[in-house]
Amino acid sequence: MPTGCSDTYPRLIGDIGGTHARFAVIDSPGSPPTRFRTLCCDDHAGLLEAVQAYLLLERGLAGPRVAAFGIANPVEGDRVRMTNHDWSFSIEQLRIELGLARLVVLNDFTALALSLPRLQAGERRQIGGGNECAGRPVALIGPGTGLGVSGLVRCGNGYAPLEGEGGHVTLAASTPREAELIAVLAARFDHVSAERALSGPGLIALHDAIRQLAGAPPLALEADEISARAMAASCPWCAEALQVFCGMLGSVAGDLALTLGAFGGVYIGGGIVPKLGDFFDRSDFRRRFEQKGRFSEYLARIPCYVILAEYPALLGAATALDNALAGETGT
């Protein structure tokens, strides 16, 4: 339930990734977010400057009283140094510089997890079978600039988000071909985590490794171009890279579902998978998700959903702000 203290509006909410910073405003109790804008992180020296640029663009906006930002980084203590960007800031100093009475900063995938109970039927697409069980744990995984992992567990009348860095678990091969590719990645990285393959940079690394093993000359392609060529079936190396990506993601998502007992469903977010459409539906994702030997039938009962909502993490940031303010007022 949104807290209704009128003196805390307008509220600023943000979703800060390694590539883009997305902002919106909630004008009054119970109203949906409005004034959506997406800014490029590289265009701004830091988060303060990005927020100031957003507020300047929204000329008719009264100064926000409180704010909540989901950020692609662990949040421990006051100092935040982003993993996939060079921004660094003090939460308290940022609050003062923005003139806010309250500033909540949380991990972006924690924010995304908090949004899941608020998703409407048309804001998710099921992949494969299974039926969600109300009140059971929910898992969340999402490749983007990095690999985000989170979840929800029942707590009282609502859910509590799980905060961790599951994208950095060790990546395991399930096929001889994957073992070859991981060996190539191991020559580049001290630790081949899941994120080293299951992210935008990871898709590029897989494509590079496939070309290297084929004896083909290097070809610098961005992740979006690799995906586009794969879906158009215009490049066999791109097609294999994306197929391997989807299969590995299924395996890692299955591990997560087993760890949490995620009968509330496994949700796939991030900036890559929602753009893949039917390619992802036809990929090895679901087969590999269920392919866990003695526990294959267990996983077959767990549904998987691709998140289709345009700005879900902003809804989660709004929920985190509601919870923080409700805790302060005892409501």
From Swiss-Prot:
| A Pfam family of this chain | Glucokinase
Where on the tree of life does the source sit, at the highest rank?
A: Bacteria
Provide a Gene Ontology MF annotation, just one: glucokinase activity
Localization recorded for this chain is:
Cytoplasm
Quote the catalytic activity from the record.
D-glucose + ATP = D-glucose 6-phosphate + ADP + H(+)
Sorted alphabetically, the keyword list is:
ATP-binding, Cytoplasm, Glycolysis, Kinase, Nucleotide-binding, Transferase
At which positions is ATP bound? G14, D15, I16, G17, G18, T19
Disulphide-bridged cysteine pairs: none
E.C. number: 2.7.1.2
* Gene Ontology terms: biological process: glycolytic process
UniProt GO cellular component terms:
cytosol
The record's family statement is: Belongs to the bacterial glucokinase family.
HAMAP family given for it?
Glucokinase (MF_00524)
Q: What is this protein called?
A: Glucokinase
Which organism does this record belong to? Aromatoleum aromaticum (strain DSM 19018 / LMG 30748 / EbN1)
